[in-house]
Each structure stands twice: as C-alpha cells, then as structure tokens.
Amino acid sequence: MASLRKTHPLLKIANHALVDLPAPLNISAWWNFGSLLGLCLASQIVTGLFLAMHYTSDISTAFSSVTHICRDVNYGWMIRNMHANGASFFFICIYLHIGRGLYYGSYLYKETWNIGVILFLLTMMTAFVGYVLPWGQMSFWGATVITNLLSAVPYAGEALVQWIWGGFSVDNATLTRFFAFHFLLPFVVLAATLLHLLFLHETGSNNPAGLNSDADKVPFHPYFSYKDLLGFAILLLALTSFALFAPNLLGDPDNFIPANPLVTPPHIKPEWYFLFAYAILRSIPNKLGGVLALLFSILVLMLVPLLHTSKMRGSTYRPLTQLLFWALVADVLILTWIGGMPVEAPYIVIGQLASLIYFSIFLAFLPLAGLLENQALK
C-alpha cells in the first residue's frame, strides 16, 4: 500500500515539493537562499502579526504605540527588533538569491525568473509602506518624497499623488491605508511565492555546472532538507544576534523623532536596501527621467533572459562574464554608498558614472561578452 503522503490530495503536493522532489546532486550553498527567503517571509508574517495586535494606525498614536510595544508588551522589544532587522535579512537573502540566479544562468527559466522579479517588486512595496508605520521623521519624509515621485507621471501625476495620499499631504488617511497595504501585501507575496515554486518545479533546479542533471538527482529529503536546516540555524543565529546586540545599527536615528511636517531632516534617505535604486534615481537631473531609471533599475532584470547570447548557461566556465558579474556587484555596492551620501561635489558624478555602468553591464557588456566567448569556443 502506498504511503499516505503519496496518496492524500494535500500531502501529495507537499510531498512533491519537499520530500520526493528530485534535486541536482551538485547544488551548492548558493541554492539555500530560496528556502531562507521562505523562512524570512514566515518570520516576518509571524512577528508582524504580533506587532499588529498592539499597533495603532493613527498619526496621533502610531509613534507612541510603537514605544508602548517596546516598553510594556511582553518581549515586545524583541518582536519589534526581529521584525525590523528581519526586513534587512530578507533583502540580504534576496540580493544573494538574485546574484546566484545571474551568475549561474538560472534566469533562463523565464517564468520562474519573471515571477521572481515581480516578487522582488512586491517585497520592495511591502518594505516601503512598512517603513512609514512607526511615524518617525524618516517615515514621514520618506513617504512624502517617494509618493511625490508619481507626480512625474504626465497629465495624471498630481491627481495620482493626491489619490494615494487621500488628501493634499501625507496625513492620517495615508498612514491608515499604508497599514492596510502592509498587512495585505505579505500574503500576496506568499501567493506569488507558491507560483514561483510551481514554475520552478516544472523544470527542476539549475546547478553550478549549468548542465542537464536529469541523470544525477537525489531526493530533496533528507539530503537538502537537512542542508536547508543548517542554513536556517545560521540565519536565525545571525538575526537574533542582530536583534539583541545591534538592533538599531541598520536603522536611521531620525526615526526616533516623531514625524513633524514642519521640520525637514537634513538628509532624506531610504533604508540601506533601497539605496542603490535611490542613487540611480538621484543621478538623473530630470524628474520623470529619474523615476523611469528607478523603475528600470529593477525591471532591467526581466531583460536578462532575452539578452543571453552565450552557448553556455552559467558563468562557471566564462571568465569574461565572471569579470563583468563581479564588476556589477562592486557597482551596486558603490551605488549603495552613494545613495546614502548628500547630493554634492564628488558624489554626484560618481553616482552618475555608477548608474551608467550599471545599465551598460546589463544591456551591452554582458551580451557582448557572451558573443565574444562563443567566438573563443570555435
């Protein structure tokens, strides 16, 4: 008689995804980040749910309700620190996951890749509306600056901004709806994650060699389930250490000041994980141009599968592409640094150069390197 996990309508799905899934034998630790992102999402939903039980989405009480959570709620400080730093770890895992996909050519699974990019955009939206909720100075001014970007939309811009604000400025209506969105979006992310997995399991995982691995697969459990558990332990250790020892290291000190529409902070900047895109936005002097560059800095990922010219899949045996990949990594780090700097003398031109290099690598250098390497193979 067949096991229940193979016959039960629900357990059968879980079995095919987590137990009997054929996985390539040679996938490295770079393939751990998908499951780590699942762990981050679960952790964020659980901690977020407990925070939502005590948070009030009203401008007169939002800031003090967060203070109340940290002071008066049992382990409230811990839940809040886990949630705030959990977002940072979420994005660290996302960037490593995307980097792995770019390096090893996983983007050639087009449906999986494109849903991944949509997931990335959804996660960015979720993090943005979440950052507004504590109603500190940076929350308020960040919301004002970023929502204002929509005014660059021709003809409908002004109406669009006021529609999102629910008035003529960022006010109570804005905070209330942002809380509603922040509660809803993680579940949309969860649904999109299931689609991401569904499409991945249609093809199976890629591997470091970039070759077909049908002849050499092992069951996901116990091999990769235990490998993932090790990753879970490392991530949770790092996250709890951060939440306990350096909870405010990645935050902005300005957010400890309650929101004041009459006082603008000296440097308005988003959380560290958005700085690279913020730098690209600022490097273009035209408002609409900047907004388009900001959008395209993420959407350019959708073009990567279309611009793949090489006969080989991954970068494992392609030295030129490897060089460009690491140049891209360095470039994103430079953009992240520039995004946190004031708009003045050396930083402006560095940001513009780094933005130009960012798009050039994606749109020109990588496809050209692929063609060159094809020639070298002949």
Curated annotation (Swiss-Prot):
It comes from the Eukaryota. Keywords: Electron transport, Heme, Iron, Membrane, Metal-binding, Mitochondrion, Mitochondrion inner membrane, Respiratory chain, Transmembrane, Transmembrane helix, Transport, Ubiquinone. CDD domains: cytochrome_b_C, Cytochrome_b_N. Binds 2 heme b groups non-covalently. A ubiquinone binds at residue 201. Heme b b566 binds at residues 97, 196. One of its GO terms (molecular function) is ubiquinol-cytochrome-c reductase activity. It is a multi-pass membrane protein. One of its GO terms (biological process) is mitochondrial electron transport, ubiquinol to cytochrome c. It is found in: Mitochondrion inner membrane. The chain crosses the membrane at residues 33-53, 77-98, 113-133, 178-198, 226-246, 288-308, 320-340, 347-367. Component of the ubiquinol-cytochrome c reductase complex (complex III or cytochrome b-c1 complex) that is part of the mitochondrial respiratory chain. The b-c1 complex mediates electron transfer from ubiquinol to cytochrome c. Contributes to the generation of a proton gradient across the mitochondrial membrane that is then used for ATP synthesis. Heme 1 (or BL or b562) is low-potential and absorbs at about 562 nm, and heme 2 (or BH or b566) is high-potential and absorbs at about 566 nm. The cytochrome bc1 complex contains 3 respiratory subunits (MT-CYB, CYC1 and UQCRFS1), 2 core proteins (UQCRC1 and UQCRC2) and probably 6 low-molecular weight proteins. This is Cytochrome b. The lineage of its organism: Eukaryota, Metazoa, Chordata, Craniata, Vertebrata. The gene is mt-cyb.
